[in-house]
UniProtKB/Swiss-Prot annotation:
Gene3D superfamilies: Zinc/RING finger domain, C3HC4 (zinc finger) (3.30.40.10)
Organism listed in the record: Homo sapiens (Human)
Positions of the RabBD domain: 4-124
UniProt region (Disordered), positions on chain: 146-277, 390-465, 499-541, 553-600
Summary of the function given for this chain in its UniProt record: Rab effector protein involved in melanosome transport. Serves as link between melanosome-bound RAB27A and the motor protein MYO5A.
Listed name of the protein: Melanophilin
Illness: Griscelli syndrome 3: Rare autosomal recessive disorder characterized by pigmentary dilution of the skin and hair, the presence of large clumps of pigment in hair shafts, and an accumulation of melanosomes in melanocytes, without other clinical manifestations.
GO molecular function: actin binding; myosin binding; protein-macromolecule adaptor activity; small GTPase binding; zinc ion binding
């Protein structure tokens, strides 16, 4: 049994003919229902008599259980009923040839009612099918019921078939069907409801259906689109009385439908009721149906459990699908946040690797010697560079040149220094590239035989090294600022309720020291002076470019004015004796005053 019924290929005449056939079917059902109601009334009266006779068992031994006539030998002998076990007279019972015994008239009527109401059949069919029959057709053609014969058919269908709201139908489809004109032949895919099965499969009385019918009669009068007659309300009055009487007694002929009846009235069902009702009386229709559903809920609590196994769960499936969709959207948002966190962790790991590399390559040997006494590759490179600088210093100090030659050397050395220092401020912001360039420049051989190297003084070599260290330190500080920014973002994510997994490597901080301005040494002291501290000239400091330029210009002007400038003692004291105690781990952290003047 499909959930949708496509009747778009039917013309209006064919649809009207189908509706007339369904209307005749409803009329026959109503007549049969009235007949069965009369039989049920008789059965109820007989049951009350039996209850009285069951209390007085000795009375049934002498009198008939139905007509209360005394038994007579050969004229009115007593016979026991095979159904109830009571004794009746010959006129109040009949022979059952298949069972080879007597059955009293009340038990025979009960069997007739059960066969006429098809309870013996629908108790098994309801567990297999949920919707079929003429009610399915009438629901599919609901859009065409807005015409002449529509209201009467709707009222009959509501009284005989529909006593529940839509469980798994789509409310939008019925709204489209109501909006279409009568002559429209567009395709209509209308939903089929759970309660379609009830009216088509049940010919017995249903009090909740009649209450729904009564609530729909005044609404049809109020609606401007409907043409009603007084016969519907007149027929509904006896149905209401019979339905209330049957609900109080709970007769055996009245059966309920456990699989279609809900245990509670949800807001979605009220919405479906509002769409099924005409515009004039939607509230009255919804209230009547809600009252009918309340009575059905009370009756369904006493049903066997095997009938509750095939309940239509389409509403639950739609709700579950909606919940799953919301879960998927939340999961997608959580996945995007997790991907951002993963990218941040990768960035942090990369920055930590760069910091580790810079600490291994840029940290002076003094800091490493204090932390660990093991000599590393950086110590070996620093020592080799120191030896080369000593050779250069000795070669330059041995040459005695005039002031003109020294001026020419200074003029040649100044563009060389600009070339070596100029590109450094424009270096790539990537820390790894700057560190690679620094290592490559430190490892480049400085041959004393090179004429360009002769023109460069020892102070220029030292200033170049200071520039490299300063640039590297600034890049390390920039990397640390990026790390702090990332940590602040992670803290914000954690404050928002997201969990951030730390990276595999522990967080390390840079051990780079903060360099102070370099010391050139006092001019009044010689390196061999006992007051001069060799360890005070050990640190290489970051000097700004403008100060370095001013320092070189002052040296050049002093060379011009005074020829008695002793270069050998001053420069050799600042370069060749660079922290001799660094390898022993006994370096002092005192610094000399930055005095730049020559002896007059």
């Amino acid at each position: 049994m499909g959930k949708k019924l496509d009747l778009s290929k039917l013309t209006d005449e064919e649809a009207q003919h189908v509706l007339e056939v369904v209307q005749r079917d409803f009329d026959l059902r109503r007549k049969e229902e009235e007949r069965l109601e009369a039989l049920k009334g008789k059965i109820k009266k007989e049951s009350s008599k039996r209850e009285l006779l069951s209390d007085t068992a000795h009375l049934n031994e002498t009198h008939c259980a139905r007509c209360l006539q005394p038994y007579q030998l050969l004229v009115n002998s007593k016979r026991q009923c095979l159904e109830c076990g009571l004794f009746t007279c010959k006129s109040c019972g009949r022979v059952h040839p298949e069972e080879q015994g007597w059955i009293c008239d009340p038990c025979h009527l009960a069997r007739v009612v059960k066969i006429g109401s098809l309870e013996w059949y629908y108790e098994h069919v309801k567990a297999r099918f949920k919707r079929f029959g003429s009610a399915k057709v009438i629901r599919s053609l609901h859009g065409r019921l807005q015409g002449g014969a529509g209201p009467e058919l709707i009222s009959e269908e509501r009284s005989g078939d529909s006593d529940q709201t839509d469980e798994d139908g789509e409310p939008g489809s019925e709204a489209q069907a109501q909006a279409q004109p009568f002559g429209s032949k567009k395709k209509r895919l209308l939903s089929v409801h759970d309660f379609d099965f009830e009216g088509d499969s049940d010919d017995s009385t249903q009090p909740q259906g009649h209450s729904l019918h009564l609530s729909s009669v005044p609404e049809a009068r109020d609606s401007p689109q409907s043409l009603t007659d007084e016969s519907c309300s007149e027929k509904a009055a006896p149905h209401k009385a019979e339905g209330l009487e049957e609900a109080d007694t709970g007769a055996s002929g009245c059966h309920s439908h456990p699989e279609e009846q809900p245990t509670s009235i949800s807001p979605s069902r009220h919405g479906a009721l509002a769409e099924l009702c005409p515009p004039g009386g939607s509230h009255r229709m919804a209230l009547g149906t809600a009252a009918a559903l309340g009575s059905n809920v009370i009756r369904n609590e006493q049903l066997p459990l095997q009938y509750l196994a095939d309940v239509d769960t389409s509403d639950e499936e739609s709700i579950r699908a909606h919940v799953m969709a919301s879960h998927h959207s939340k999961r997608r948002g959580r996945a995007s946040s997790e991907s951002q966190i993963f990218e941040l962790n990768k960035h942090i790991s990369a920055v930590e690797c760069l910091l580790t590399y810079l600490e291994n390559t840029v940290v002076p040997p003094l800091a490493k010697g204090l932390g660990a006494g093991v000599r590393t590759e950086a110590d070996v490179e620093e020592e080799a560079l120191r030896r080369k600088l000593e050779e250069l210093t000795s070669n330059v100090s041995d040459q005695e040149t005039s002031s003109e030659e020294e001026e020419a050397k200074d003029e040649k050395a100044e563009p060389n220094r600009d070339k070596s220092v100029g590109p450094l401020p424009q270096a790539d912001p990537e820390v790894g590239t700057a560190a690679h360039q620094t290592n490559r420049q430190e490892k480049s051989p400085q041959d004393p035989g090179d004429p360009v190297q002769y023109n460069r003084t020892t102070d220029e070599e030292l200033s170049e090294l200071e520039d490299r260290v300063a640039v590297t330190a600034s890049e390390v500080q920039q990397a640390e600022s990026e790390v702090s920014d990332i940590e602040s973002r992670i803290a914000a994510l954690r404050a928002a309720g997201l969990t951030v997994k730390p990276s595999g490597k522990p967080r390390r901080k840079s051990n780079l020291p903060i360099f102070l301005p370099r010391v050139a040494g006092k001019l009044g002291k010689r390196p061999e002076d006992p007051n001069a501290d060799p360890s005070s000239e050990a640190k290489a400091m970051a000097v700004p470019y403008l100060l370095r330029r001013k320092f070189s210009n002052s040296l050049k002007s002093q060379g011009k004015d005074d020829d008695s400038f002793d270069r050998k003692s001053v420069y050799r004291g600042s370069l060749t004796q660079r922290n001799p105690n660094a390898r022993k781990g006994m370096a002092s952290h005192t610094f000399a005053k930055p005095v730049v003047a020559h002896q007059s």
